[in-house]
Curated annotation (Swiss-Prot):
Predominant place of localization: cytoplasm
Protein name as catalogued: Ribosomal RNA small subunit methyltransferase G
Record localization: Cytoplasm
Sites where the protein binds S-adenosyl-L-methionine: G66, F71, I119, E120, R135
Top-rank EC class of the record's enzyme: transferase
Function summary: Specifically methylates the N7 position of guanine in position 527 of 16S rRNA.
Gene name for this UniProt entry: rsmG
Length: 205
């Protein structure tokens, strides 16, 4: 099996397939993603989320903000299971969604844990990390503000944020408050979308 050109082992494929079944079951009673995107679960959500691991395929410690339906946090945690290293801290304050995330991690033997707390309280509970991810959560300025407790003054901590076609405007707005190094990774799944890699964060105002 391949996802965006990434060769996926039989074991990881099985984990992803089991996650997809769990997701479809829980999505009947909990609003995990926009209902209009459920039919495109593999392409729109799983393949899209797997790009995070393709960009950073190392056994590092992640914080996934506003994990919701598990994208990209659970997908990253599933890939880390094959590496037998690294960890994903999934932050989700909605307790029903947090229950789904715990079930998904447990049943796929993925490498992660769930923190059912507000993002603003997460850094005190989780501590340092190497990477931060978020998808469909907030504009770039908001994501950087959420990530600042981990990233400010930490040269080795990077943020990886999925963004749509309006990303250039979001970058310009964020640069009004922050200085940062930026790499734009073109999406292999969604045309005109990117994953923004942020590092060396400094506050301007």
């Amino acid at each position: 099996m391949e996802l965006n050109g990434l060769r996926v082992s039989r074991e990881t494929q099985g984990r992803l397939q089991h996650f997809a079944l769990l997701f479809q079951k829980w999505a009947k009673t909990i609003n995990l993603v926009a209902p209009s995107t459920l039919d495109a679960l593999w392409h729109r959500h799983i393949a899209d989320s797997s790009q995070i691991f393709q960009i950073c395929p190392r056994p590092v410690t992640w914080v996934d903000l506003g994990s919701g339906g598990g994208f990209p946090g659970v997908i990253t945690a599933i890939f880390l299971a094959e590496l037998q290293g690294g960890w994903v801290h999934l932050v989700e304050s909605n307790h029903k969604k947090a229950a789904f995330l715990r079930t998904a991690l447990r049943e796929t033997n993925a490498r992660g844990s769930v923190h059912a707390i507000r993002i603003e309280d997460a850094s005190a509970e989780i501590g340092d990390c190497d990477a931060i991810s978020a998808r469909a959560l907030a504009d770039l300025d908001g994501l950087i503000a959420y990530s600042a407790p981990w990233m400010l003054g930490k040269e080795n901590c990077r943020g990886f944020f999925h963004k749509g076609r309006d990303y250039l405007r979001e970058i310009a707005e964020a640069r009004g408050r922050w200085e940062f190094d930026l790499i734009e990774h073109e999406s292999a799944v969604e045309q005109e979308s990117v994953i923004l890699e942020i590092s060396n964060l400094r506050r301007l105002v």
